[in-house]
């Protein structure tokens, strides 16, 4: 399956380069040390340019983590919402600056656009401030596993064939997030913890559960067809790391609600992390040890070990 051709408008292209250009200057923070060192870091569905993007939490992760390669797996910039009205607060600016600074300091940063930043797909093969733009990619882990990296919207029939319905669904999702924000403000005042209305609805609606299962199966099958041992994707805002019919299926989650990332340790171990800025360490939600591409299943997660290294962020 190949992406549909998209010709960005001049406004789209201007906003894309403008969003990257705002990070041209240093972000004003100098991190003496990074707490965690990873071989690879995957992030998706950040949705910069929206009010529900948790940019401050992401910035905290970027300050504490160093990786040799960072893959931005789509929907990094929310072009759909920016077309409706420009929203770009300082925290979103800081995230862009941090990414560009990492690229300048030698980190390989690869941007794989999704449907919300599809305007960038015509820039395939180009570099902006050291950030490489690709439609998809193949990553080879330390233990030799080939992972196909793609946002995932190519496998969403609504996005590909009924874009008006996709935009309607996005509007309903934004409305749900707004309700969720108000609800959790009230819960916080009453002393209750965070609760996700959108995740609750996804789990209760039969069609949503069926859609997620089909999406995951299709991605795993396509990765195998491409002679890869697994796939890393985003799009559905559902963090996951497991085996499907022998193939690794990894979904980075999002930075709207779940605050999750996929990482590869130096030995090829894959971990799905949930980042909590106030916590002493990220929560490891799932883990696949080296060699899992051929034999293993997800194991009980272990906490990542803090490794103080010179920060290249």
Predicted segments with their positions:
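Core catalytic region of metal-dependent phosphoesterases/phosphodiesterases
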Residues: 2-20, 34-39, 50-142
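Non-catalytic terminal accessory segments
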Residues: 2-17, 133, 200-229, 239, ...
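Residue-level marker for buried hydrophobic side chains located in beta-strands
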Residues: 40-42, 70-72, 148, 232
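Short active-site segment of divalent metal-dependent hydrolases/proteases
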Residues: 48, 77-78, 154, 238
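Conserved beta-sheet core of the metallophosphoesterase superfamily
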Residues: 129-136, 148, 153, 157-167, ...
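Binuclear metal-dependent phosphoesterase catalytic core
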Residues: 140-143, 239, 243-313
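Active-site-proximal loop/helix segment associated with metal-binding centers of metalloenzymes
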Residues: 152-215
């Amino acid at each position: 399956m190949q992406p549909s051709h998209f010709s960005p408008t001049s406004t789209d292209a201007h906003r894309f380069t403008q969003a990257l250009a705002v990070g041209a200057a240093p972000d004003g923070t100098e991190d003496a040390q990074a707490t965690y060192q990873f071989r690879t870091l995957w992030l998706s569905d950040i949705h910069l340019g929206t009010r529900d993007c948790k940019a401050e939490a992401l910035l905290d992760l970027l300050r504490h983590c160093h990786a040799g390669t960072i893959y931005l797996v789509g929907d990094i910039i929310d072009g759909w919402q920016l077309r409706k009205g420009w929203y770009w607060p300082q925290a979103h600016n800081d995230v862009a600056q941090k990414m560009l600074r990492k690229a300048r300091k030698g980190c390989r940063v690869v941007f794989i656009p999704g449907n919300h930043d599809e305007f960038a797909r015509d820039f395939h093969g180009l570099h902006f401030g050291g950030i490489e733009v690709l439609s998809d990619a193949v990553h080879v882990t330390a233990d030799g596993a080939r992972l196909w990296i793609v946002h995932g919207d190519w496998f969403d029939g609504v996005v590909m064939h009924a874009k008006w319905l996709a935009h309607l669904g996005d509007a309903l999702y934004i409305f749900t997030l707004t309700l969720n924000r108000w609800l959790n403000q009230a819960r916080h005042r009453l002393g209750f913890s965070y609760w996700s209305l959108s995740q609750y609805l996804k789990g209760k609606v039969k069609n949503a559960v069926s859609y997620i299962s089909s999406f995951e199966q299709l991605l795993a099958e396509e990765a195998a067809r491409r002679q890869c041992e697994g796939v890393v994707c985003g799009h559905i805002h559902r963090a996951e790391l497991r085996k499907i019919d022998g193939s690794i299926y990894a979904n980075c989650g999002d930075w709207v609600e779940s605050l999750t990332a996929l990482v590869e340790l130096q030995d090829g171990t894959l971990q799905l992390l949930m980042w909590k800025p106030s916590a002493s360490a990220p929560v490891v939600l799932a883990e696949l040890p080296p060699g899992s591409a051929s034999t293993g299943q997800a194991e009980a997660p272990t906490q990542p070990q803090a490794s103080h290294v010179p920060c290249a962020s």
